[in-house]
UniProtKB/Swiss-Prot annotation:
GO terms for biological process: rRNA processing. This is Uncharacterized protein in ffh 3'region. One of its GO terms (molecular function) is methyltransferase activity. It comes from the Bacteria. It holds the Pfam family SPOUT_MTase. Transmembrane segments: none annotated.
């Protein structure tokens, strides 16, 4: 199974970073995970999202 996680912006609070890392460690045992981080500018990245969804 392949999972793509598309994120807008970055996590800024330590609690969220720790929670994400823990969850990621659990998931990567069962699936191939790709994390794509985009800028917070939604309009500027819309074409990139469409391109990623076409895969």
């Amino acid at each position: 199974m392949k999972i793509k996680i598309i994120c807008f912006g970055k996590l800024d609070k330590k609690f969220y970073i720790d929670a994400f890392n823990d969850y990621f460690k659990r998931l990567e045992k069962y699936a191939d995970i790709e994390i794509i981080e985009l800028k917070e500018e939604i309009n500027g990245e819309l074409n990139k999202i469409k391109e990623l969804n076409s895969d």
